[in-house]
Swiss-Prot record:
Compartments it resides in: Mitochondrion
Active site: 172
Keyword presence, Metal-binding: no
Protein family according to the UniProt entry: Belongs to the HIBADH-related family. 3-hydroxyisobutyrate dehydrogenase subfamily.
Organism whose genome encodes this protein: Caenorhabditis elegans
Pathway: Amino-acid degradation; L-valine degradation
Sites where the protein binds NAD(+): 2-30, 96, 247
Main location per the UniProt record: mitochondrion
Statement: the UniProt record of this protein carries the keyword Manganese: no
GO BP: valine catabolic process
UniProt protein name: Probable 3-hydroxyisobutyrate dehydrogenase, mitochondrial
Amino acid sequence: MSLTGFIGLGNMGGHMARNLIKNGKKLIVYDVNKAVVQEFKAEGCEVAAHPADIAAASKEIITVLPSSPHVKAVYQGEAGIFKTIQPGTLCMDSSTIDQIVSLEVAQAAALLKAEYIDAPISGGVTGAQQATLTFMVGAGNDATFKRAEAVLSLMGKNIVNLGAVGNGTAAKICNNMLLGIQMVAVAETMNLGISMGLDAKALAGIVNTSSGRCWSSDTYNPVPGVIENIPSCRGYAGGFGTTLMAKDLSLAQNASTNTQAPTPMGSLAHQIYRILARDPQYQAKDFGVVYQFLKKQNS
């Protein structure tokens, strides 16, 4: 059986990789966290010492990495994928990064007669666990999209073809900016209502059956006790961290500057999450902890 390469076994990537295993894929994996790598080795996966080892062993590679510098290092570093990549290899990158980096890596892959597509994801840790993720794919052509879809559909349920390489990243940046704005809005709405004497569950129920309904309210409410089995009910542990949200909002602000498209609400959300990402109380917490931050501002 041919090997599928998987690089990045964190909160999202780990679950995604396991869904590939459940669907019969044989993996060769790499992550800087050696303890996690050993877990996958115990589950029957082959282990690579460097990303280059994965490229030498596989013509189908998935990467899920934290930021643009990580993507550059994994693909173009001294022991990176491009050192040993085989012609015809398809690289599917589900990282959330600057659009320009996606385009640069794609161009470098093409020079090596390989393909790089951006396929960022939405759906959170739960979506990664349950294989219900949405993939926003910039594949460049239909043939490449169909090849990628056969793999991505094992990890998600909505595989969306957005056309040119870079478009997936653009869509993800826009989506996550909206998510950050929504979470701040839901947190301040809940804080205001509770401060006015409303029961948290009752207020959430009204919002979720009215025009204010959104994912941050009806699925991922930041107030502890409103929804079970999400980070706000376990001290904001796990989930999508404040540092990652600050990073994604920074990407949106970079795009806003480059395109001269105004994003005033995105800018405000970015300022708030930059504060949280720098504060030891909040920096290791899920981004819903913005509710606790706002609550502490009550006079």
